[in-house]
Amino acid sequence: MSDAQQPVFNIEKLYVKDLSVEVPNAPAVYLEREAPQMEVNMSTESRALNEDMYHSSITVTVTAKLGDKTMFLVECTQAGIFRIQNVPQDQMPMVLGIGCPNIVFPYLRETVSDVVIRAGFPPLLLNPVNFEAIFVQQQQAQQQQAGAAQTH
């Protein structure tokens, strides 16, 4: 393989695309001593920007509740722009579904932890995410849906 045909994977830009924090029950919520229940919802998205530039993002929503009272709500979308060249087309879904999110996630985790601290709460560290397992599950679900659509 010549240098011109070598696979290229470069991070062009990592950035916070969207960030919001709400503390709807402040200041009373700061008097609470119990640990809140945490609910974390996460999604990923990838798309082509042009022939060799791709955008990948992870959106997370973290809701901390004590009973029916919301202590805080954080929504964050961390994104990256990647230059990807000379990667076989059949491998692109894996690069976009596993490789890019694995690079973006640590930055998302840091941003969420920082904003929770700035909102006056103890640090929140998001648990590591196995993007490979999520990718495999999504592929299996798509294959099952395709199989079900063909039988109807």
Swiss-Prot record:
It comes from the Bacteria. Keywords: Chaperone, Cytoplasm, Protein transport, Translocation, Transport. It is found in: Cytoplasm. The keyword Chaperone applies. GO terms for molecular function: unfolded protein binding. GO terms for cellular component: cytoplasm. One of its GO terms (biological process) is protein transport. It holds the Pfam family SecB. Homotetramer, a dimer of dimers. One homotetramer interacts with 1 SecA dimer. One of the proteins required for the normal export of preproteins out of the cell cytoplasm. It is a molecular chaperone that binds to a subset of precursor proteins, maintaining them in a translocation-competent state. It also specifically binds to its receptor SecA. Belongs to the SecB family. This is Protein-export protein SecB. It comes from Thiobacillus denitrificans (strain ATCC 25259 / T1). The gene is secB.
